[in-house]
From Swiss-Prot:
Ranges for domain Ig-like C2-type: 147-232, 237-317, 325-403
Residues with glycosylation annotation: 87, 104, 113, 148, 152, 173, 197, 224, 256, 288, 292, 302, 315, 331, 374
Residues spanning the signal sequence: 1-34
List of residues that carry Phosphotyrosine: Y488, Y513
Stretches the record annotates as Required for homophilic binding: 39-142
Protein known as: Cell adhesion molecule CEACAM1
Gene name, Swiss-Prot/TrEMBL: Ceacam1
Family as reported in the entry's similarity comment: Belongs to the immunoglobulin superfamily. CEA family.
Organism: Rattus norvegicus
Tissue: Expressed in epithelia, vessel endothelia, leukocytes and platelets. Isoform 1 and isoform 2 are highly expressed in liver and intestine, moderately in lung, and weakly in muscle, kidney, and spleen. Expressed in granulocytes, lymphocytes, granulocytes, B cells, and T-cells.
Keyword Signal: yes
Membrane topology value: Single-pass type I membrane protein
Domain Ig-like V-type: 42-140
């Protein structure tokens, strides 16, 4: 038996990676006294493949080492030995011609089979011929055939109770994994596995179960994957959807409708206008439409496999553009508290009416009433704030027009006063009222003081002519009859107040009389 290092130079070893590892270790003997161990690389081997029993930590100065089948060291179980002093190897009775021994203590197996699955023992004698033994074992697994997926129904219909897929062939000591569209499947509410995961069952079939299913067979040494299995779930059609959603169109525009319904296989499409078949396509196009094209448009879809059909109906109305309306008014100049009626006239039918005041949408008050169709506006009673420009707007779903403005003038009623006072006017009224009250109080105090202080004050009071008028009742002090005089003063106050509705008898002037008696 030749050394593996010599055979490697002639390129006769097929498993290049393992041989390179063993060869490198031949020239790299660790300077250590660690325990001798052996690893199987790989520990799980596919039949007819190779395995390397890789030795570690051989003594630097060993004499000889042996490889045996099993754990008993009898001569019949010897595979090979290596004698360091002679730098040569020698085969034993258990040698099969598939083994290669290396000077670093490793053993290489080619074309392993299930019978090779056992323990192997390395026995090393150090420089003093002390024996050192260690064992290793590897497992051999069959090569896996490419699996194949079969199903009880490759075209199930949505809603069917179940569909089953099977991964074949069956192999001992093999696990099976499933995926759909490249994503792993796990057991759930509608997904069950049986027969060691070889059978996949989908319950209550749904359209989402549609896709490509793969089965993977795997053992500790290798794996293999099936070709995709196409599960094509039949369903539909769903209720068709017509787009765009518009149902009102302008006369002269183009009508372009499309219909879509989710269905497998794809549904057949038919268009009906006012229940008459028009075309058997997914789209409907009519150019330069008129009001005669108004009506019901139906999309009918049919699935020839499921035998199901669905219909969606759309009512479409074609409108002409509206013309400009006009306003008729009973009177453009109205007295306050009177009434006025405005009427919006249009040649168009089926239109909506909206009123504008000073170019803004009219805010209705409790004095305003509209007719049922909004075409007539009545204001009663009218007030000065109702004066302004009035317009009416008519519209249909595709157009609108606004009338020319009508100006309404309101003649104020003088009895109604000025309904709107500025802040300055209000402040003036308040100040005037307060000043009047203060003046009255001062005068009353003055007269009271004069009365309690003596008659000499009478002359002083009557001397203030700009603000009072003085009158003397009875004879003067020079009169022989000596009749007591009665003096009185008249104060007139006239305060400006806001113009508010008052009765005709009300007077803006108030007179205050003060009487002073002389004792």
């Amino acid at each position: 038996m030749e050394l593996a290092s010599a055979r490697l130079l002639r390129g006769q070893i097929p498993w290049r990676g393992l041989l390179l590892t063993a060869s490198l270790l031949t020239y790299w003997s660790p300077l250590t006294t660690a325990q001798v161990t052996v690893d199987a690389v790989p520990p799980n081997v596919v039949e007819e493949k190779s395995v390397l029993l890789l030795a570690h930590n051989l003594p630097q100065e060993f004499q000889v080492f042996y490889w045996y089948k099993g754990t008993t060291l009898n001569p019949d179980s010897e595979i090979a030995r290596y004698i360091r002093s002679d730098n040569m190897s020698k085969t034993g009775p258990a040698y099969s011609g598939r083994e290669t021994i290396y000077s670093n203590g490793s053993l290489f197996f080619q074309n392993v089979n299930k019978t090779d699955e056992r323990a192997y023992t390395l026995s090393v004698f150090d420089q003093q011929f002390n024996p050192i033994q260690t064992s290793v074992q590897f497992r051999v697994y069959p090569a896996l055939q490419k699996p194949n997926v079969t199903g009880n129904n490759s075209n199930p219909m949505e809603g069917e109770p179940f569909v089953s897929l099977m991964c074949e062939p069956y192999t001992n000591n093999t696990s099976y994994l499933w995926s759909r569209n490249g994503e792993s499947l796990s057991e759930g509410d509608r997904v069950t596995f049986s027969e060691g995961n070889r059978t996949l069952t989908l319950l209550n079939v749904r359209r989402t179960d549609k896709g490509y299913y793969e089965c993977e067979a795997r053992n500790p040494a290798t794996f293999n994957r099936s070709d995709p299995f196409n599960l094509d779930v039949i369903y539909g059609p769903d209720a068709p959807v017509i787009s765009p959603p518009d149902i009102y169109l302008h006369q002269g525009s183009n009508l372009n409708l499309s219909c879509h319904a989710d269905s497998n296989p794809p549904a057949q499409y038919f268009w009906l206008i006012n229940e008459k078949l028009q075309t058997s396509s997914q789209e409907l196009f009519i150019s330069n439409i008129t009001t005669n094209n108004s009506g019901t448009y139906a999309c009918f879809v049919n699935n020839t496999v499921t035998g199901l059909s669905r219909t969606t109906v759309k009512n479409i109305t074609v409108f002409e553009p509206v013309t400009q309306p006009s306003i008729q008014i009973t009177n453009t100049t109205v007295k306050e508290l009177g009434s006025v009626t405005l009427t919006c006239f249009s040649k168009d039918t089926g239109v909506s009416v909206r009123w504008l005041f000073n170019s803004q949408s009219l805010q209705l008050t409790d004095r305003m009433t509209l007719s049922q169709d909004n075409s007539t506006l009545r204001i009663d009673p009218i007030k000065r704030e109702d004066a302004g420009d009035y317009q009416c707007e008519i519209s249909n779903p595709v157009s609108f027009r606004i009338s020319h403005p009508i100006k309404l003038d309101v003649i104020p009623d003088p009895t109604q006063g000025n309904s709107g006072l500025s802040e300055g006017a209000i402040a003036g009224i308040v100040i005037g009222s307060v000043a009047g009250v203060a003046l009255i109080a001062a005068l009353a105090y003055f007269l009271y003081s004069r009365k309690t202080g003596g008659g000499s004050d009478h002359r002083d009071l009557t001397e203030h002519k700009p603000s009072t008028s003085s009158h003397n009742l009875g004879p003067s002090d020079d009169s022989p009859n000596k009749v007591d005089d009665v003096s009185y003063s008249v104060l007139n106050f006239n305060a400006q107040q806001s113009k508010r509705p008052t009765s005709a008898s009300s007077s803006p002037t108030e007179t205050v009389y003060s009487v002073v008696k002389k004792k």
